[in-house]
């Protein structure tokens, strides 16, 4: 177990070292917990979170039966894209945080693209 955690931490550092959000193209960071999914749009040059969404957001909290499914990830992706477009953000850099680009991560990214964000 310890070795797999070390490998994951290495992947996180490797991916994060290559990705940096700017004012023009902020970073869309995704975290996948055991029970919930979180997404943030971050401007690294100023150190400011521009928008955030999760399965714990008031807009989604009562509407989802189970919070860790692909459908929940799609809902979070649509919500984060909606909030970003309201703030004037159209282009982002996708930070998958070492997770494989399948399942929930892919569903969140695809829905965010369909809702108006460009990666």
Swiss-Prot record:
The cross-references to Pfam families, in alphabetical order and at most eight, read: Ribosomal_L18p (PF00861)
Please provide, in alphabetical order, the Gene Ontology terms of the cellular component aspect for this entry: cytosolic large ribosomal subunit
Source organism's superkingdom? Bacteria
Q: Which GO terms of the molecular function aspect are on file? A: 5S rRNA binding; structural constituent of ribosome
Record's keyword terms, sorted = Ribonucleoprotein, Ribosomal protein, RNA-binding, rRNA-binding
From its record, what is one biological process in GO terms?
translation
What job does this protein perform?
A: This is one of the proteins that bind and probably mediate the attachment of the 5S RNA into the large ribosomal subunit, where it forms part of the central protuberance.
Subunit note: Part of the 50S ribosomal subunit; part of the 5S rRNA/L5/L18/L25 subcomplex. Contacts the 5S and 23S rRNAs.
Tell me which NCBIfam families the record gives.
Answer: L18_bact
**What family does this belong to?**
Belongs to the universal ribosomal protein uL18 family.
Q: What is this protein called?
A: Large ribosomal subunit protein uL18
Query: From which organism does this entry originate?
Result: Endomicrobium trichonymphae
